[in-house]
Regions:
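Residues in the short beta-alpha loop(s) of Rossmann-like NAD(P)-binding domains
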Residues: 20
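Active-site-adjacent segment of FAD-dependent monooxygenases/related oxidoreductases
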Residues: 25-106, 117-120, 208
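Short, mixed charged/polar active-site loops
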Residues: 69-70, 139-144, 202
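Conserved FAD-binding catalytic core of PHBH/FMO-like flavoproteins
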Residues: 101, 134, 149, 153-258
Length: 335
């Protein structure tokens, strides 16, 4: 959506396809850093996103005795050399809703229920075969799209990357994590991010824009039991004391594992990749969505100029030259 808006604003008409029937209601991504806020400001969507967000004043990191001895480390927000120094907490579905509205207002086309089956390219363009599902065609109807360029911003399991046969080298982390979105009223500041490095594992507590909280805990490697709130309750008591209030049933409860991977090439002739199709990493630091937003913003103006006959392949090559080192640094940082 960032790429689509930027292309439409630059006079480069585009069409987006997504095999999902619509936006997902849940998402792990929710942190927006200063650079993403600057990009959204340039795109004309920042104020709408801010209205859906909670601004964090600080990041607190506590040791193995929880809040008993106070934070080991506090990072005050507001000191970055940016017009938007605060970290914003805004769940990805809300961000996507704002971006989709902006994209459509600019005349952009978005096809839901449209799955990419195959893609071929030659010196003059790209031909994509898409399976379009609808109420009239439950089994789907094949459609063929001819385009000058194609960008795969289709996530960690990118069909575009797979079709190109590009290596996605890296490894899996051994730990697994539980994530819960809960109604909770702890004795914690609701304008700060809280991380607890506890003796038996970690706890992250993030206040959400709607007064709920997001909790994340580490699990023992190989845990396969159905996830529940028991481990969250243990970590909360360890972090905040035996008298701390405990959340009841979660709105959303999920287990996830983490990979660290980076694609070998961001471009193969007229087909390019962006975001999680290029790089996946630990969610610590909220880098994934932000790096993908910056990928798209960097790429968009290059595509517009290329389609107008400027820069040629050298201009498209500059995308990988500029963005892949950023991903390499980011992966080292979150490790």
């Amino acid at each position: 959506l960032t790429l689509g808006i930027s292309l439409m604003r630059g006079g480069g008409p585009c069409r987006m396809i997504d095999k999902l029937p619509g936006r997902l209601p849940w998402s792990r991504a929710l942190g927006l850093h200063a650079r993403s806020e600057e990009i959204f400001d340039a795109m004309g969507v920042l104020e709408a996103v801010r209205r859906q967000s909670r601004a964090f004043q600080a990041i607190h990191v506590y040791g193995d005795r929880g809040r008993e001895k106070g934070p080991l480390l506090t990072l005050p927000m507001g000191e970055l050399p940016s017009p938007f120094p605060q970290l914003l907490c805004c769940p990805q579905p809300r961000i996507e809703a704002v971006l989709e509205e902006r994209f459509r207002s600019l005349g952009g086309e978005l096809w839901w229920n449209a799955e990419l089956l195959d893609v071929q390219q030659d010196g003059s363009g790209v031909r994509a075969t898409v399976l379009q599902r609808s109420e009239e065609h439950q089994g789907g109807e094949e459609r063929h799209l001819q385009t000058e360029l194609l960008v795969g911003a289709d996530g960690a399991h990118s069909r575009v990357r797979e079709t190109l046969g590009l290596p996605f080298a890296g490894n899996d982390y051994h730990e697994s994590f539980l994530l819960a979105d809960v109604d909770w009223n702890p004795d914690l500041e609701n304008d700060a991010f809280h991380g607890f490095l506890l003796a038996d594992g970690n706890l992250i507590a993030i206040p959400m824009p709607d007064a709920g909280w997001r909790l994340v805990v580490t699990e023992e490697p190989g845990e396969e039991a159905e996830p529940d709130m028991a481990l969250f309750h243990e970590r909360i008591r360890e972090a905040l004391g035996d008298q701390a209030p405990l959340p009841d049933e979660p709105r959303w409860l999920s287990r996830f594992t983490i990979q660290r991977r980076l694609v070998s090439h961001y471009r193969r002739n007229r087909i390019l990749l962006a975001g999680d199709a290029c790089h996946v990493q630990s969610p610590l630091g909220a880098q994934g969505m932000n790096t993908g937003i910056a990928d798209a913003f960097n790429l968009a103006w290059k595509l517009v100029l290329f389609c107008r006959g400027h820069g040629g392949g050298a201009l498209l090559d500059s995308y990988q030259r500029e963005r892949r080192p950023v991903a390499e640094d980011m992966l080292r940082g979150v490790d």
